[in-house]
A protein has these predicted regions:
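Class I SAM-dependent methyltransferase SAM/SAH-binding core
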Residues: 1-51
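A conserved beta-strand element that flanks and buttresses the S-adenosyl-L-methionine
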Residues: 59-60
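Hydrophobic adenine-recognition pocket in adenosine-nucleotide-binding enzymes
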Residues: 64
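Conserved beta-strand signature within the Rossmann-like core of class I S-adenosyl-L-methionine
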Residues: 82-102
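Short alpha-helix
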Residues: 110-136
Length: 163
């Protein structure tokens, strides 16, 4: 059964009037099939390679970073041009060491990265972005049931602007 697109697309790169989506290859393949069937507008393009997304003023990533297998700053460097603004939502964080655990998605388990908040924010600043706003999403905090001594993670959002 093909996955549903709307909750799975995690990174949207806008370029008016068209939109460009980046996601994992399996999700992108499903999205392309849905576009071919007319379920998704033809103006929306799907990429599994950041370098092929084109330039954008705004990068919106919601729930992407915990599944991204490279540092976010490397993802930004892979784009044709760094966007002026970045809006991140649902970024899994903790105050301790960064770690990777497994998340159950349907019958599968997938790697799930939880970043160290201080290090992540320092990387963003070092890569040339100013954090203009940040917010907590308390309902997405969770504790790894097999490792409760690690404490709960938190979910954050960020609005950033290139310096």
């Amino acid at each position: 059964m093909a996955p549903s697109i709307s909750p799975l697309i995690r990174c949207l790169i806008f370029r008016a009037p068209n939109g460009r989506f980046f996601d994992l290859p399996a999700i992108i393949n499903t999205a392309r099939k849905k576009r071919a069937l007319g379920d998704i507008p033809a103006q929306i393009h799907f990429q599994d390679n950041p370098a092929a997304t084109g330039t954008a003023d705004l990068l919106l990533a919601s729930g992407l970073l915990q599944y991204l297998d490279t540092p976010f700053t490397d993802f930004i460097k892979a784009l044709p041009e760094p966007p002026m603004h970045i809006l991140l939502n649902k970024v899994a964080m903790r105050d301790g060491d960064a770690l990777v655990t497994l998340e159950q998605i349907s019958p599968n388990r997938v790697p799930y990265r939880i970043r160290n908040r201080q290090n992540f924010e320092a990387e963003l600043t070092h890569s040339g972005y100013v954090i203009r706003d940040t917010w907590l999403i308390p309902e997405l905090a969770h504790t790894i049931t097999t490792h409760p001594w690690l404490g709960a993670s938190e979910s954050r959002g960020y609005l950033m602007e290139r310096a």
